[in-house]
């Protein structure tokens, strides 16, 4: 069995290949690249916008170029704005003159890469609503209004029904007794009555049953 130090020895060819690989992957041999970025960004007048310029360079110089909106065939103009860490372009506050295409250029020594560009759209601010409330608050208000309307419609009618019932229970018996004690013939002048409506006959029947009488004994009442 070989000793320990002899077993840990590596062939020179393997060490040479590892050195070549490390040299090939060093910072100087890496290709510089820049991300495309979003195709467009929309903001309102007066807001702040931040355009990213993501790249893999270590010692780079980032510049931004602005392509005017009126004519894209014109050469881009260097935009001298506020550039943050990592080449981020900061525009605040935004106005309509900032519209157009923005491209970042990354320089690392002799290597230069550019992004595809991001178009900045600037629109007028949305009108502020009279009642700036959320949807949940609006739904709660509508529910409360419905409950209030239901109460306003049901409660008065219910109170009127109970009031009418209470009046009938309190005064119904007295009114009924008054109608029973009232003399229906009070104030009636018997002389002015028709002879067919003579109420002074007492219990005498108005008509006679001629079917139950004999013909000889029939005595019809004369009018």
From Swiss-Prot:
Residues 32-140 are extracellular. Pfam families: Ig_3, ITAM. This is B-cell antigen receptor complex-associated protein alpha chain. B-cells. The gene is CD79A. The modification Asymmetric dimethylarginine is found at residue 201. Keywords: Adaptive immunity, Cell membrane, Disulfide bond, Glycoprotein, Immunity, Immunoglobulin domain, Membrane, Methylation, Phosphoprotein, Receptor, Signal, Transmembrane, Transmembrane helix. Required in cooperation with CD79B for initiation of the signal transduction cascade activated by binding of antigen to the B-cell antigen receptor complex (BCR) which leads to internalization of the complex, trafficking to late endosomes and antigen presentation. Also required for BCR surface expression and for efficient differentiation of pro- and pre-B-cells. Stimulates SYK autophosphorylation and activation. Binds to BLNK, bringing BLNK into proximity with SYK and allowing SYK to phosphorylate BLNK. Also interacts with and increases activity of some Src-family tyrosine kinases. It comes from the Eukaryota. Residues 1-31 form the signal peptide. The record marks 207 as: Required for binding to BLNK. The transmembrane helices of CD79A and CD79B chains and two IgM heavy chains assembly in a four-helix bundle structure that appears to be conserved among different BCR isotypes. One of its GO terms (cellular component) is membrane raft. Phosphorylated on tyrosine, serine and threonine residues upon B-cell activation. Phosphorylation of tyrosine residues by Src-family kinases, including LYN, is an early and essential feature of the BCR signaling cascade. The phosphorylated tyrosines serve as docking sites for SH2-domain containing kinases, leading to their activation which in turn leads to phosphorylation of downstream targets. Phosphorylation of serine and threonine residues may prevent subsequent tyrosine phosphorylation. Arginine methylation in the ITAM domain may interfere with the binding of SYK. It promotes signals leading to B-cell differentiation. The keyword Transmembrane applies. Residues 162-223 are cytoplasmic. It comes from Bos taurus (Bovine). Residues 32-120 form the Ig-like C2-type domain. The chain crosses the membrane at residues 141-161. Heterodimer of alpha and beta chains; disulfide-linked. Part of the B-cell antigen receptor complex where the alpha/beta chain heterodimer is non-covalently associated with an antigen-specific membrane-bound surface immunoglobulin of two heavy chains and two light chains. Interacts through its phosphorylated ITAM domain with the SH2 domains of SYK which stimulates SYK autophosphorylation and activation. Residues 174-202 form the ITAM domain. The modification Phosphotyrosine is found at residues 185, 196, 207. Glycans are attached at residues 56, 61, 71, 95. One of its GO terms (biological process) is B cell proliferation. It is a single-pass type I membrane protein. Disulfide bonds join 53-104. It is found in: Cell membrane.
């Amino acid at each position: 069995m070989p000793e320990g130090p002899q077993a840990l020895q590596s062939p020179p060819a393997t060490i040479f290949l590892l050195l070549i690989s490390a040299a090939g992957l060093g910072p100087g041999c890496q290709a510089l690249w820049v991300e495309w970025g979003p195709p467009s960004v929309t903001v309102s007048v007066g807001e702040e916008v931040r355009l990213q310029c993501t790249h893999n360079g270590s010692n780079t110089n980032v510049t931004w170029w602005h392509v005017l909106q009126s004519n894209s065939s014109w050469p881009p103009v260097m935009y001298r704005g506020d550039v943050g860490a990592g080449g981020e372009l900061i525009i605040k506050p935004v106005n309509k003159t900032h519209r157009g295409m923005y491209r970042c250029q990354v320089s690392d020594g002799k290597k230069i890469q550019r992004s595809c560009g991001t178009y900045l759209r600037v629109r007028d601010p949305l009108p502020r609503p009279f009642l700036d409330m959320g949807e949940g608050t609006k739904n709660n208000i509508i529910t409360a209004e419905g409950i209030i309307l239901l109460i306003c419609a049901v409660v008065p009618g219910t109170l009127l029904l109970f009031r009418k019932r209470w009046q009938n229970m309190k005064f119904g018996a007295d009114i009924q007794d008054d109608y029973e004690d009232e003399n229906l013939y009070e104030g009636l002048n018997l002389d002015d009555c028709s002879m067919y409506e003579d109420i002074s006959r007492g219990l005498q029947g108005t008509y006679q049953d001629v079917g139950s009488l004999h013909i000889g004994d029939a005595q019809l009442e004369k009018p």
